[in-house]
């Protein structure tokens, strides 16, 4: 698999670059003052990227104001928006949120289910690509594509000597990440 060097603000990630520390806020993102203060504190203690959830319209509306407060304080730490079930709607309705972020995280298993998954994912990716932003496909146990996992379980049961549930789960996570990355490239991300 090819890996790329990516610039996020002044930070470089990828081959040859040092490992970067990313932190995530634990504030309500809609609380602009509290979230901006925590971003600044995390940057002060060494975080090189700061991520916060963007789960609803209040959060999406707050993002540009958070960015403004952080930048007005002289802090250039890249801001990362973590999107889940409704990211396609939030990015469509609040382009200023997208513009204010340096990077976005997409959970492929939390972008919609069944027939809506592909169109929701595609909408997010196309908006991110059009804005020239960086995205990360983030797969974890809480956001694995349930359909993909169930398919893996069915295929495993049909084998003469099935693999462990843990192995099936790990394989589904990898497949989810790789297939989502391929789809993201198809929809416009480099």
Where are these regions (language model features)?
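N-terminal pre-triad scaffold of radical SAM enzymes
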Residues: 22-25, 139
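N-terminal amphipathic alpha-helix/helix-capping segment at the start of soluble metabolic enzymes
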Residues: 1-23
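Active-site beta->alpha loop and helix N-cap motifs at the rims of alpha/beta catalytic domains
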Residues: 47-179
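Catalytic-site microenvironment of enzymes
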Residues: 179-189
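Conserved mixed alpha/beta catalytic, RNA-binding, or beta-rich assembly cores of soluble enzyme
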Residues: 24-30, 34, 49, 173-177
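Short, acidic/polar
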Residues: 30-41, 87-95
């Amino acid at each position: 698999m090819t890996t790329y060097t990516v610039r996020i603000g002044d930070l470089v990630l990828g081959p040859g670059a040092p490992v970067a520390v990313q932190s995530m806020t634990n504030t309500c993102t809609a609380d602009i003052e509290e979230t901006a203060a925590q971003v600044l504190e995390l940057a002060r203690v060494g975080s090189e990227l700061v991520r916060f959830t963007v789960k609803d319209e209040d959060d999406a509306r707050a993002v540009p104001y958070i960015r403004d407060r952080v930048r007005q304080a002289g802090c250039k730490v890249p801001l990362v928006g973590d999107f889940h079930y409704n990211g396609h709607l939030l990015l469509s309705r609040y382009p200023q949120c997208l513009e204010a972020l340096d990077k976005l995280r997409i959970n492929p298993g939390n972008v919609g289910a069944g027939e809506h998954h592909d169109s929701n994912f595609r909408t997010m990716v196309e908006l991110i690509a059009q804005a020239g932003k960086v995205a990360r496909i983030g797969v974890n146990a809480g956001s694995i594509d349930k359909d993909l996992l169930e398919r893996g379980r069915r295929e495993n049961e049909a084998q003469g000597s099935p693999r462990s549930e843990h192995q099936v789960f790990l394989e589904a996570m990898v497949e989810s990440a790789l297939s989502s990355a391929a789809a993201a490239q198809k929809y416009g991300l480099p």
